[in-house]
């Protein structure tokens, strides 16, 4: 659903019903906007719809409260889809630069990682490498003022999608340069038993057999950490080289998230992350021209369809000796990387920009 809010002002008290992920932040924003004591502002969040980061800010709630105070009557504000694209925040554009080296036996010898404007969530190196540096430029995942021409905000696992895509793509490039299987290469450089466990579990469930990339099988692997949760995903894709299109056929995802309070809910979150991840990996992109937003509805801003959904297998590993960790975002962070690595395995072409649109895939195929 789009952003919506209903506001009612009664004397020096305000009640606002809003679709928001941040009710206390909304309360404070509304109080400042209409000059009320925050203790006299009540925000009610109906149990409906989803946010995925987009409902973090509260412009529609502030707008409704201002109007209600002005006219002296309850006011409802509901954005159209076009207004949603225009007024809402965007996931920040980012650039990642990586320099890395391997020794004579293929071992990682150094790692120099710089991320600009995506923040450092997901950037720390968890592979064993003797010489490494990770630097994040910009303020958090929004960058310093003036970094972006439009408002930026959270998008499910803010920044980690970008950082995991960059790191896991580079790890696959290093494995290929070393002449080693990408799963075996990762295991060779992992010392954390939690990550080793999820990767081995995913590979076993998938039925992975070692092969140097590109094996032409269309298999990809990626690992990540988010919100204290360890995740490893393996995917199989088919690429139409002529059209530059990708069909994700199968995804196996193993996740270790401490003690799991609601296993069915955790499984559904993993599946939702995988499906949603198809979008940022393959199609979701906003185009601008002369300060104008060209994509204002789903006719040009393509999100995943039911017909895109692959066979999905999820494995939740028990870790009852550890406290509960995040379950709503980790599985999405690896989707860009696992699909990119599968495309490279299928075709030998490496796509280094998200989303991996048909034009970008064909360009990568053309350049080899």
Predicted regions located by residue number:
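Cofactor-binding beta-sheet edge motifs in enzyme active sites
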Residues: 1-368
């Amino acid at each position: 659903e789009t952003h919506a809010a209903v506001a009612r002002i009664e004397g020096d008290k305000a009640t606002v019903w809003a679709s928001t992920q941040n009710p206390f932040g909304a309360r404070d924003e509304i109080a400042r906007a209409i000059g009320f004591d925050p203790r006299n502002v009540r925000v009610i969040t109906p149990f409906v719809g989803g946010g995925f980061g987009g409902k973090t800010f509260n412009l529609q709630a502030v707008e409704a409260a201002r109007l209600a105070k002005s006219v002296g009557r309850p006011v409802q504000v509901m954005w159209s889809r076009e207004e949603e694209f225009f007024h809402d925040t965007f996931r920040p554009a980012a650039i990642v630069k990586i320099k890395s080296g391997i020794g004579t036996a293929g071992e990682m010898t150094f790692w120099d990682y710089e991320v600009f404007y995506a923040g450092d969530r997901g950037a720390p190196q968890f592979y064993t490498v003797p010489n490494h540096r990770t630097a994040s430029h910009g303020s958090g995942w929004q960058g310093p003022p003036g970094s972006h021409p439009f408002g930026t905000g959270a998008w499910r696992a803010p920044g980690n999608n970008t950082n995991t895509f960059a790191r896991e793509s580079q790890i696959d490039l290093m494995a290929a340069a070393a002449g080693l299987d990408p799963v075996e290469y990762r295991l060779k450089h992992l010392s954390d038993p939690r990550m080793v466990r999820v990767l081995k579990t995913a590979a076993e469930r998938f039925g992975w057999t070692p092969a140097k990339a590109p094996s032409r099988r269309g298999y990809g692997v990626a690992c990540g950490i988010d919100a204290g949760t360890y995740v490893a995903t393996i995917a199989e894709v088919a690429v139409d080289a002529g059209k530059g299109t990708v069909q994700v056929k199968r995804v196996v995802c193993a996740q270790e998230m401490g003690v799991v309070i609601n296993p069915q809910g955790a499984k559904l979150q993993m599946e939702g992350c995988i499906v949603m991840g198809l979008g940022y990996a393959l199609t979701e992109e906003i185009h601008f021209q002369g300060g104008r937003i060209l994509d204002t509805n789903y006719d040009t801003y393509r999100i995943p369809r039911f017909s895109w959904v692959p066979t999905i297998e999820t494995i939740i590993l028990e870790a009852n000796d550890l406290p509960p960790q995040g379950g709503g975002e980790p599985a999405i962070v690896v989707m860009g990387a696992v699909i990119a690595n599968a495309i490279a395995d299928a075709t030998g072409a490496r796509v280094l920009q998200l989303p991996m649109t048909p034009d970008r895939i064909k360009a990568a195929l053309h350049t080899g």
